[in-house]
């Protein structure tokens, strides 16, 4: 190995390590299936359109405008529907499709949200929660709706 190739290999190794780390961090956890009106996704300080087909990641914040609504399917088949003037944060999400084990924590900061629970909550009812500014809701059934006025 020549002296010039050693730094090149180190640099290449660092680039590959960073690429793998960024891919591992950006795991898709769900997808927008229905989008009407003004819908946006805030991710890492940037705002992107909440269009049909947009992939969602942990820590995404979905915002709907006065004419907006959004339908989301998570990888465990949970269905989320947010109405106008809603702010929904996907705080924590982990799902193993082999065992149906996982954890799904979200926060509704304002607006309305309807949920049909998927495989995570069916496997372990304590594993899915929705926080609001005044309460923490544990999913014990298969369907529920919540509204936050501000």
List each language-model region with its residue ranges.
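Bacterial N-terminal signal peptides
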Residues: 11-21
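Bacterial N-terminal signal peptides that target proteins for export
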Residues: 1-12
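Helix-centric, low-specificity signal for extended rod-like, repetitive segments
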Residues: 1-2, 18, 112
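Flexible, surface-exposed loop/linker segments and immediately adjacent secondary-structure boundaries
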Residues: 26-150
